[in-house]
Amino acid sequence: MRSDAIKKGHLKAPNRSLLRACGLKDEDFDKPFIGVANSYIDIIPGHYFLNDYAKIIKDEIRKNGCVPFEFNTIGIDDGIAMGHEGMLYSLPSREIIANSIETVMNAHQLDALICIPNCDKITPGMLMGALRVNVPTIFVSGGPMASGVTKKGEKISLSSVFEAVGAYEAKKISEEEFKDIECSACPSGGSCSGMFTANSMNTLCEAMGIALEGNGTILALSKEREELLRKAARRICEIALDERFKIRNIITQKAVRNAMIVDMAMGGSSNTVLHMLAISREAGVALDIKDLNFISSKVAHIAKIAPSLNSVYMDDIHKAGGVSAVMAEISSRQGHILELDALTITGESLEERLKNAKIKDENIIRKVDNAYSKVGGLAILFGNLAEQGCVIKTAGIIGERKFKGKAVCFNSQDEAIKGIIKGKVQKGNVCVIRYEGPKGGPGMQEMLSPTSLLMGMGLGADVALITDGRFSGATRGLSIGHISPEAAEGGLIGLLKDGDEIEIDVDAYTIHANLSEKEITQRKKEFVLPQKEVPSRWLRMYQKLVSNASKGAVLDME
């Protein structure tokens, strides 16, 4: 056992003495030691109950002949960190989470790992850390919350509250309606109820085979979710010493491809591109941002979920057959594009896992021949504005897929929010928010507040927004993020001026500023990088090491 390094032989008597202080007995030193990586924190609705979930898991591990050791990572709620300097810390927290998993698991030489993530950066951070450790690993998330319901009987989610801010600013809803939306949107614990970043990543864990069926869709705080926890705990005990189930044997090139196929079919958050690039790097497998359009061109978009379709939420997907039903439909109808021989954590191939899966409600999960779109729900655009690519959630587009407009430029998200409220962005404009990339922010803030303001003010179908920052999974509209190279590293987005004409063609995968090479060259000569004070030592360190979004915004020592 790997854990023999801390428990076997007379030289390890001091180690055992310390372990005995934690309650271990002689017989425990012959059992596998399993790390239980929790992410319990009171301030996140998807995490405040995870201490109870960890107890269920630890009890089941003990019943099955292993010794659990719980430890915790940090967690940030992007919704609570939104709209102030706290959002600068969201993406960097992914690196802290990954580092903490690696540090604890390797410092104590634990044999296997079960991770309990749920929201935002916690799932990708845990995946990255687990891949560095490379022991048998299983993921079981806390689960999504139920959708909210207003007094009028309308189903809503957190994105509805963000959009209500814009509607209230524009005097389109009353104060009473505004308060009702605020108080109704998040009715219970769990990750936010739509296909936002948390649920997208927990769904992709299922698609990659590192989590059991239902991981992405079974509601939090349900008996069914508790049974999933027990199943996961039993399974980690079964495979704790089996090298076939080391995480790098599960998250392979095939698994990463399967994840991106499911992402396209379900219209996942644009953040998944950022995270999967980082995860694939830790797994040692190739994923180039340029490959994603090819995958998208081969995969129909068959499940549209809030915020793209406000009548469908994660619990609806679960009742309609779940992620497995989506994968089974794609597999049977689209030329076996899925890698069906990929190994899953149960020991089954993906093909075996899907053999009994079927769509139970075709109004929720559509057949391929009745798909929302013949291509996937994400796209990568290229052009002189994004030579290394940028990302758009095509599933969330509500207006035209071709757009030409005059730039209205802002050098920060805060500046953009103030400008939008003052009416500086009008119908037909392209709202440009720059110096918000991984280096420029630093930290690559989410632009949910500006996009939600535009949507709530009735401009969502008539304005494009482009940024070197990123978007919440709750964003919809013609919102293009992750522009690389970013403004802070000399990208063309930093050279734009108010009134410059920008052309976007989603179906042609292009984004272009109509500027001559002569004009661009002249602007580069005149360009002076704006200086931004970064008081945080951690963020300054992050700024120096982080790559741009086209590489996953990873800390790069090379």
Curated annotation (Swiss-Prot):
Q: Where does [2Fe-2S] cluster bind?
A: 119, 192
Q: Where is the active site?
A: 472 (proton acceptor)
Q: How is the cofactor bound?
A: Binds 1 [2Fe-2S] cluster per subunit. This cluster acts as a Lewis acid cofactor.
Annotated Gene Ontology cellular component terms = cytosol
- What keywords sit in the KW lines? 2Fe-2S, Amino-acid biosynthesis, Branched-chain amino acid biosynthesis, Iron, Iron-sulfur, Lyase, Magnesium, Metal-binding
Pathway annotation from the record:
Amino-acid biosynthesis; L-isoleucine biosynthesis; L-isoleucine from 2-oxobutanoate: step 3/4; Amino-acid biosynthesis; L-valine biosynthesis; L-valine from pyruvate: step 3/4
Gene3D superfamilies per record: IlvD/EDD C-terminal domain-like
User: InterPro entries from the entry?
Assistant: Dihydro-acid_dehy_C, DihydroxyA_deHydtase, DiOHA_6PGluconate_deHydtase_CS, ILV_EDD_C, ILV_EDD_N, IlvD/EDD_N
User: Recorded E.C. number(s)?
Assistant: 4.2.1.9
Q: Which GO terms describe its molecular function?
A: 2 iron, 2 sulfur cluster binding; dihydroxy-acid dehydratase activity; magnesium ion binding
Record's PROSITE patterns? ILVD_EDD_1, ILVD_EDD_2
Presence of the UniProt keyword Magnesium in the record: yes
What reaction gets catalysed by this protein? (2R)-2,3-dihydroxy-3-methylbutanoate = 3-methyl-2-oxobutanoate + H2O; (2R,3R)-2,3-dihydroxy-3-methylpentanoate = (S)-3-methyl-2-oxopentanoate + H2O
The record ties this protein, via SUPFAM superfamilies, to: IlvD/EDD N-terminal domain-like (SSF143975), LeuD/IlvD-like (SSF52016)
Q: Which GO biological process categories is it annotated with? A: isoleucine biosynthetic process; L-valine biosynthetic process
PANTHER family, A to Z: D-XYLONATE DEHYDRATASE (PTHR43661), D-XYLONATE DEHYDRATASE YAGF-RELATED (PTHR43661:SF3)
Assembly description? Homodimer.
Family (UniProt): Belongs to the IlvD/Edd family.
Q: What is this protein called?
A: Dihydroxy-acid dehydratase
Protein species of origin: Campylobacter jejuni subsp. doylei (strain ATCC BAA-1458 / RM4099 / 269.97)
